[in-house]
Amino acid sequence: MKLYEHDGVDLEDGKTVKSGGDKPIPRKIHNRALLSGLAYCISSCSMILVNKFVLSSYNFNAGIFLMLYQNFVSVIIVVGLSLMGLITTEPLTLRLMKVWFPVNVIFVGMLITSMFSLKYINVAMVTVLKNVTNVITAVGEMYLFNKQHDNRVWAALFLMIISAVSGGITDLSFNAVGYAWQIANCFLTASYSLTLRKTMDTAKQVTQSGNLNEFSMVLLNNTLSLPLGLLLSYFFNEMDYLYQTPLLRLPSFWMVMTLSGLLGLAISFTSMWFLHQTGATTYSLVGSLNKIPLSIAGIVLFNVPTSLQNSASILFGLVAGVVFARAKMREKS
């Protein structure tokens, strides 16, 4: 049984296709697209804001444990849905885990550096600095896969670099440690996206069905991250902190952490749903536009000190992200 059914509608081309001889139902399809897009935007924004709340407002100093708990929640839910027959996942064989382990190391590093950077940097600047990932990915595609980008893409990437540099210079709450973690996160995120496709192709060859759906990848990534996360948590001396902190004795804190785990899984589900109801181009553009309300919410909710120059740099970076998304659309078309 699948969670989402496909109605044979290609919204990217503006076409409505009949299903089984029935009359076209564009209103229903557009409502689904709107609902899935709204769910994706809410879950992705909420995830970052809740993580920021846990790390900064609660002053929780165990980012690796937070990631570990979130992934554990995801594993429990995915396994439960699979046992109920609501979703289909591939068996986690030893061969499959061996193939996936290298990319999982990058995945864990990506999550951990994101946690560490979010603790020290305000949400708006994190969203702008994440644009650097696009620059690294574009350069990586050019050198690794001989993929050429047109001038509009490079112009948008140049605008992203300017916005990131100017944003850092004008950031009133600048923190060098946080910026270092975020730059590391950009390199790891780009590495993950560059290696994921090849790893997926290899992994499909060792699965029982010859495929690897999104639910299987969520289960595979999160399951493999648990032992690695435990080792890193011990290496960073988080165990001593966890033993001493009074936060773990607060039911409200566990509720917030569990919510963050549910939101992490919700992003996976809603992104698949939204992508299924619309297409890659709309998904990419909405993802860029989604950073605008996220940045505003981050500044307002956490009382971030800002200046006109820094606000302008942030806005410039967000606009550059939208320009980049549109340039990529035209490049693909």
Swiss-Prot record:
It is found in: Golgi apparatus membrane. Keywords: Antiport, Golgi apparatus, Membrane, Sugar transport, Transmembrane, Transmembrane helix, Transport. One of its GO terms (molecular function) is antiporter activity. It holds the Pfam family TPT. The chain crosses the membrane at residues 33-55, 62-84, 99-121, 153-170, 174-196, 216-238, 253-275, 282-304, 308-325. It comes from the Eukaryota. Its main location: Golgi. Disruption phenotype: Dwarf phenotype, necrotic lesions and a constitutive hypersensitive response to salicylic acid induction. InterPro entries: Sugar_P_trans_dom (IPR004853), TPT_transporter (IPR050186). One of its GO terms (biological process) is GDP-fucose transmembrane transport. It is a multi-pass membrane protein. GO terms for cellular component: Golgi apparatus; Golgi membrane. PANTHER family: SOLUTE CARRIER FAMILY 35. Belongs to the nucleotide-sugar transporter family. GDP-Mannose:GMP antiporter (GMA) (TC 2.A.7.13) subfamily. Involved in the import of GDP-mannose from the cytoplasm into the Golgi lumen. Required for the luminal synthesis of a variety of plant cell surface components. Is required for the correct mannosylation of the glycosylinositol phosphoceramides (GIPC). Can indifferently transport GDP-mannose, GDP-Glucose, GDP-Fucose or GDP-Galactose in vitro. This is GDP-mannose transporter GONST1.
